[in-house]
Amino acid sequence: MGSDTSTQLLGTDGIFFDAAWDVRVTDTSLRDGSHHKRHQFTADEVRAIVAALDGAGVPVIEVTHGDGLGGSSFNYGFSKTPEQELIKLAAQTATNAKIAFLMLPGVGTKEDIIEAQGNGGSICRIATHCTEADVSIQHFGLARERGLETVGFLMMSHTISPEKLAKQARIMADAGCQCVYVVDSAGALVLDGVADRVAAVVAELGSDAQVGFHGHENLGLGVANSIEAVRAGAKQIDGSTRRFGAGAGNAPVEALIGVFDKIGVKTGIDFFDIADAAEEVVAPAMPAECLLDRNALIMGYSGVYSSFLKHAIRQGERYGVPAHQLLHRAGERKLIGGQEDQLIDIALEIQRENAANGQ
């Protein structure tokens, strides 16, 4: 799949993209799914999932702590197995798939990128809040200097206009990013909101870089939004097999492939094989199904970063406050990734309000 004869370079040299594909799908079960699993992946689980996804034809598999390189910490949650070990294991297991890793400037370091590459990662995905693309410039420079393929994540893309998002995408592309993603971190975008943002970024970047979309299921629109993104010009799409991701999960890869097959979008992934992988390999590794429940819906409706879910549940139990109330108030305050600790302040605030009201 990754040979010189089967790989077409589109727009920017060095992008892993087979000439037979219309869209490149990245499975992020082993990164976004880390949030749902509280970062407790084992080596055996990663080996089995990578083998199953690779066998189904998934071209890119992302493996990292949920919050990216260096995310194993008190604030975000400690990994059961060091992420660098998992990246190395994934790279050793995959036959055709490329292994991607995520890093957030300020959480991970340039040294982490170098180590991940040494362990077999070949696609470096760098994420910033959608208004802070400038903090990624040096990291893209390093990644390109080292021959890594680069992807940029503009997180919480629902919070700014398509025009402003396009300007931020330009910063990433000029820094060396080969594909800029519109990232619906909260699962808050609805159909046209995705299409308008993707189209604006496509128009801004032209042939300088590809455009991607990363969706969540918090309003039940992960697949539909991904279709809107493709129709607006996106060439890379994220999903998680069995919706294994933060919040209500990501767009399920097996459903994406089924729909893509129906509408004639070629991905190189076999529908039946990915459905088998979801049912027989990924599902057993999940602590529970990713549910579209009240908490998840509140996140999508209020625009809350999807990884807040487990933190809100934990703080809600600790302080005797319903998690959905914490999440709604987090949305009102427009909290972003990295501000999970403020859920404690919100919980104490609601506690005081309840006490004052005799509850």
From Swiss-Prot:
CDD domains xrefs: DRE_TIM_HOA (cd07943)
Record-listed substrate binding positions: 31-32, 185, 214, 305
Sequence positions that bind Mn(2+): 32, 214, 216
Keywords of this entry: Aromatic hydrocarbons catabolism, Lyase, Manganese, Metal-binding
Family: Belongs to the 4-hydroxy-2-oxovalerate aldolase family.
PANTHER family given in the database record: 2-ISOPROPYLMALATE SYNTHASE 1, CHLOROPLASTIC-RELATED (PTHR10277:SF9), HOMOCITRATE SYNTHASE-RELATED (PTHR10277)
Protein name per the record: 4-hydroxy-2-oxovalerate aldolase 1
